[in-house]
């Protein structure tokens, strides 16, 4: 099974940024553990702070992969274009957020992605990525 993990802006700073909200583990460390646990799956990873690069990656994998795990970061609440890109592809997407976006500031409760995703995992920390993989391989 081919699964793409796509992370949006500032997720490259996990482990350094707001550790009280996002935890102290870097995504690279977490990804290594994830790839080891799911060694029978092909897991690709992409991160960008640039909206257009995220859209390009969604389009690149969106017709050939079995699943996309997508954390759009701050673009969740602002990018109609990312929502449109997800609507345009055939690969199912699970939207993942490390923090509970529905329990934070009011502006974070809007997602331009959720309505196009097959599901949303929010507030379960990095475990949300693992749960998304479990969904795809079930």
Predicted segments, located by residue:
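Short, glycine-/small-residue-rich phosphate/pyrophosphate-handling segment
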Residues: 44-45, 94, 103-138
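Short Gly/Thr/Asp-enriched flexible loops that form oxyanion-binding sites at enzyme active sites
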Residues: 79-88
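Short acidic/histidine-rich motifs immediately flanking catalytic phosphotransfer sites
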Residues: 61-68
């Amino acid at each position: 099974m081919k699964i793409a993990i796509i992370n949006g802006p500032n997720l490259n700073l996990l482990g350094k940024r707001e550790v009280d909200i996002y935890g102290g583990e870097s995504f690279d460390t977490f990804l290594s553990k994830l790839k080891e646990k799911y060694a029978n799956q092909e897991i690709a990873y992409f991160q960008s702070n640039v909206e257009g690069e995220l859209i390009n990656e969604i389009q690149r994998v969106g017709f050939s992969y079995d699943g996309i795990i997508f954390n759009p970061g701050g673009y969740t609440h602002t990018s109609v274009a990312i929502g449109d890109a997800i609507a345009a592809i055939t690969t199912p997407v699970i939207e993942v957020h490390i923090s509970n976006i529905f329990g934070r500031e009011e502006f974070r409760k809007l997602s331009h992605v959720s309505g196009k995703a097959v599901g949303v995992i929010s507030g379960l920390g990095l475990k949300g990525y693992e749960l998304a993989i479990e969904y795809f391989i079930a």
